[in-house]
């Protein structure tokens, strides 16, 4: 009869991240995944509101730290720390920017930007630009994305304009959006714009909606982070590059686990590539010759789920209903009503897949006149009911267990 192994005292580990950002939250989630998939016993210290506060960190009576080194204050506070530390943050073109004495897990900025660039070029956009952040120590990662963007421009022999805009503040918000719209109007069209974060991408969408710039016909927009909260705040679903943040968290936890057992990795750098792109409406660019169709689709994307009719679209565009129908038949081989219905159906499919609402709620929120009408549309277009569609999505995403 074998004895059970003696229980080990858990290691006390501090996680210094600001989980109000999706980037930090997903790194923390990756650390949690590592703990669940191993027999590691860690007592994790985080602030109750998941914010990073450095006061007293020098007196932390623990065994190790995983920290966000994109925050200059964190990097400074941990300089010379006697505990094992794993740094997490941005990749750098200049290798001297990495902390020389620590292992460093980095998001690969060059690959993030390259993936966004390739996606926009593949969508048929001949012009590209970037919307970044003002230069600041805490924004060094954004400047690294600028360098990657400019390098691609030089490699391809094309212009690579960058606009940094203003830092976000309530007092300067209106002015910032106005200046952003001026820059957007100055760009050759059609253009694809890479925003250094989803938050900056939302600014672009706001400016386009306020000033009647068609997305994605005139300006296609892609962000970085795949932040679900940002998606809820935009009328036009935002395409975004998915960072490998959970893998970064797992890798950081794995390194610290080894360090707690005596291993050392001074100066080791591990670059983690992006997972892929969540492609949504903001980059589904289709070259169109008719400005009337561009303007109509811009309006439909915003208001399809609010029960708009063909007459309202024609009024917005400023042409007769019959003329608009003719433009649609030539360009899209469909009617205006069919285009409105397509957007309603796409919205309903997305809501059903998320399982956040009942079928009746989906019908109301997606602008169908009744639940019965939504059922009829699903039957006609997808040959299934909304419930059957929801079940098929759930079954497709369920994990498959291999049999021995």
Regions found by a protein language model. Name each.
Residues 328-335, 377-389:
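A secondary-structure capping/hinge motif
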Residues 402-404:
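Intrinsically disordered, low-complexity protein-interaction/activation regions
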Residues 311, 337, 360, 376, ...:
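Residues within the helices of the helix-turn-helix
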């Amino acid at each position: 009869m074998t004895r059970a192994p003696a229980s080990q005292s858990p290691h006390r580990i501090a996680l210094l991240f600001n989980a109000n950002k999706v980037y930090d939250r997903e790194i923390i989630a990756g650390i949690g995944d590592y703990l669940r998939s191993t027999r590691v016993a860690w007592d994790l210290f985080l602030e109750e509101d998941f914010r990073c506060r450095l006061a007293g960190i020098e007196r932390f009576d623990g065994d190790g730290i995983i920290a966000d080194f994109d925050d200059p204050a964190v990097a400074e506070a941990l300089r010379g720390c006697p505990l094992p530390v794993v740094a997490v943050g941005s990749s750098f073109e200049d290798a001297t920017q990495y902390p020389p004495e620590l292992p460093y897990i980095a998001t690969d900025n060059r690959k993030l930007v390259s993936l966004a660039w390739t996606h926009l070029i593949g969508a048929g956009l001949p012009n590209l630009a970037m919307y970044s952040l003002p230069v600041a120590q805490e924004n060094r990662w954004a400047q690294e994305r600028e360098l990657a963007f400019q390098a691609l421009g030089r490699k391809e022999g094309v212009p690579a304009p960058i606009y940094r805009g203003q830092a976000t503040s309530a007092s300067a918000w209106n002015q910032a959006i106005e200046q952003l719209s001026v820059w957007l109007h100055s760009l050759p069209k059609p253009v694809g714009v890479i925003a250094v974060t989803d938050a900056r991408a939302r600014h672009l969408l706001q400016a386009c909606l306020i000033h009647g710039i068609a997305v994605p016909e005139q300006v296609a927009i892609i962000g970085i982070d795949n932040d679900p909260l940002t998606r809820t705040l935009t009328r036009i679903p935002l395409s975004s590059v998915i960072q490998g943040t959970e893998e970064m968290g797992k890798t950081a936890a794995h390194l610290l686990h080894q360090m707690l057992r005596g291993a050392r990795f001074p100066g080791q750098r591990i670059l983690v590539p992006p997972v892929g792109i969540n492609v949504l409406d903001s980059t589904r660019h289709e070259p169109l010759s008719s400005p009337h169709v561009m303007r109509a689709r811009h309006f439909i994307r915003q208001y399809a789920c609010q029960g708009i009719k063909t007459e309202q679209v024609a009024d917005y565009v400023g042409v007769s209903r019959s003329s608009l129908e003719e433009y649609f038949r030539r360009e899209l081989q469909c009617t205006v009503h069919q285009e409105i219905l397509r957007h309603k159906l796409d919205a309903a499919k997305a809501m059903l897949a998320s399982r956040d609402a009942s079928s009746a709620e989906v019908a109301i929120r997606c602008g169908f006149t009744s639940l019965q009408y939504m059922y009829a549309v699903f039957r006609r277009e997808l040959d299934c009911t909304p419930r059957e569609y929801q079940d098929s999505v759930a079954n497709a995403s369920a994990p498959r267990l291999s049999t021995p």
